[in-house]
């Protein structure tokens, strides 16, 4: 019964507007509380921002830095609200986490020119895993708004002087615009892609460089897919449904075309 409820919940969420994922998750879990943990760990939702009380720096919240009702800051390695026995990475993995946060902070400034980013690592039996989070919002105006959320989850398995990386990347995008001539447009959705690769590792620092290249390449591919395939298709559909010309002008144009066709058949 639980499996059927879980599958039905996922199927329902896939059919609803992605911008309302958080609200819809809360509604489903209030009806079936037993699904809460499974849904929170399985469903990607827009990232939330919180400020670290110790360092005064913003960080992003997700299921990977959550322990109960508390969230761990990547800058201070402390939980908010405070948690005495919260799960934190080992000393080695924490050093890698700090280095990765510094590296992706530069990446965020270069590629996003702002926004918020956070990196979280945790230990595995034969290596370690982590998540890279990036969020950029368009400053809401009277007529437009938008948000981009990137969630990159990876596993790194040690193999002698090589490491096997498995990366799962998700982009959650929301764009909205409203004009008097065209009305309201709301474009929301998400995309997930995966890649696995073996890369050489000389030291722990190599992991940060390897993961950085994987994320950079994946984001470039996903941006191109969004722009060329999804946005291109949406543009074609909107072009078929809407016209910049008024209805009267369109009617006159169709009437002229009919007259020309009829004259050609005389």
Swiss-Prot record:
InterPro entries to which the protein is assigned, alphabetical: CapZ_alpha/beta (IPR037282), CapZ_alpha/beta_2 (IPR042276), CAPZB (IPR001698), CAPZB_N (IPR043175), F-actin_capping_bsu_CS (IPR019771)
GO BP of this protein: actin cortical patch organization; barbed-end actin filament capping; filamentous growth; mating projection actin fusion focus assembly; mitotic actomyosin contractile ring assembly; mitotic actomyosin contractile ring contraction
Coarse class of the protein's main subcellular location: cytoplasm
CC annotations in GO: actin body; actin cortical patch; cellular bud neck contractile ring; cellular bud tip; F-actin capping protein complex; incipient cellular bud site; mating projection tip; medial cortex
Keywords annotated in UniProt: Actin capping, Actin-binding, Cytoplasm, Cytoskeleton
Pfam family, one: F_actin_cap_B
Protein name as annotated: F-actin-capping protein subunit beta
Protein's organism: Aspergillus oryzae (strain ATCC 42149 / RIB 40) (Yellow koji mold)
Gene that encodes it: cap2
